[in-house]
């Protein structure tokens, strides 16, 4: 399945997540290192190790990865910790697509500062409402230019 599409399809996160079970059934590579603990004090290092494991396994294929780790970190620790991990990943990106599905309550409870930082770490942001997908556009605006126009 992975070779036909050209993408190395993978995921990482807790095995308790029902979506991970579905991805496993679809033969997506599970890059999670066991034991998995989103509350670990060395979570930054752990996430780096997971990304290295995935990159090594993918070889030269572009990666299509669903990362549930950052969602778990935002939920169990803080959104700011998840943003810090995303920022670190962005310093040394792998080729391909990385999907980071967050829970809306985790975003809304974090505050606008952390939410904006999270959005700045992503190329695109989507919100799912029922069966509809909305794309958010976030741009930094100059207050002076807005007033002058």
Protein language model regions, located:
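Non-catalytic regulatory/interaction regions at protein termini and inter-domain linkers
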Residues: 1-149
